A protein has these predicted regions:
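Two-component histidine phosphotransfer core
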Residues: 2-226, 235-238
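C-terminal beta-strand of the catalytic ATP-binding
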Residues: 239-243
């Protein structure tokens, strides 16, 4: 689509500017390696934006954070760049086809990288509560199933608040039917239950609405996505995925 191509051009220019600043901050003895890493990340980021798999707002927020970090702590900036590069590699390796699956553990590592980069911007305002059953990490799920939910939680439940908030990410095995249960919950403002459909549309982006439609196609209606919320009690999305 045209807007994706435009975002791609803008993203390319923004990333080029950001990584030029980053390269200038590196020591001369590592300049060659740093240049190769930055060039590779630049190409992947452009492709990710154009293909619609990467939120442009997250991209620009990350670039701004990296630019600021290069001036203060070049080594930390290099570590953040490696996380960013790993994220882009994961995104571009996914097909989003009906039969594409990844281990939950891989998706969780992707989410950890995403949260680490968001923490550059939000700092202590972003708190994360992990409650993962190790037995579920080998379970297979469609790629990019969890991260959009976490992104929505941060964008709508955490970032707008001065004091930030907490995101809880949970996984468990359903003992009755051996399905995988996942949930992502924020402690933000929430909403009235009868407004869930409207709120879901507002929050959806590349997340809730698309994910629900995708599960319906991938699992022939056997997967479930449920939203729980009420005013002052946050916003929670529960997933049940057959195994």
């Amino acid at each position: 689509m045209l807007w994706r191509a435009i975002w791609g051009v803008i993203a390319y220019a923004a990333i080029a500017t950001a990584f030029t600043a980053w390269l200038q901050a590196r020591r001369a003895r590592t300049a060659s390696l740093a240049a190769a890493q930055a060039e590779s990340a630049l190409a992947r980021a452009e492709l990710a934006v154009i293909s619609g798999k990467l939120n442009p707002h997250f991209l620009f927020n990350t670039l701004n954070s990296l630019i600021a970090l290069t001036r203060k702590d070049p080594q930390a900036a290099e570590a953040a760049l490696m996380r960013f590069s790993g994220m882009l590699r994961y995104v571009l390796n996914t097909k989003r086809s009906a039969d594409d699956r990844v281990p939950l553990g891989d998706e969780i590592e992707f989410v950890r990288d995403y949260l680490a980069l968001e923490s550059l911007r939000l700092g202590k305002r972003l708190q994360v509560d992990w409650q993962l059953d190790p037995a579920t990490l080998a379970d297979e799920i469609p790629p990019l199933s969890v991260q959009p939910l976490v992104e929505n939680a941060i964008q709508h439940g955490i970032a707008p608040r001065v004091d930030g908030g907490r995101v809880a990410i949970r996984s468990a095995r359903n003992t009755m039917n051996q399905g995988l249960e996942l949930s992502v919950e924020d402690d933000g403002a929430g909403c009235e239950p009868d407004l869930i459909d409207d709120t879901a549309r507002e929050r959806s982006g590349i997340g809730l609405t698309a994910l629900r439609r995708r599960f319906a196609l991938d699992y022939d209606g056997r997967a479930r996505l449920q939203i729980r919320t009420r005013p002052g009690a946050g916003f929670r999305v529960d997933l049940w995925i057959p195994q």
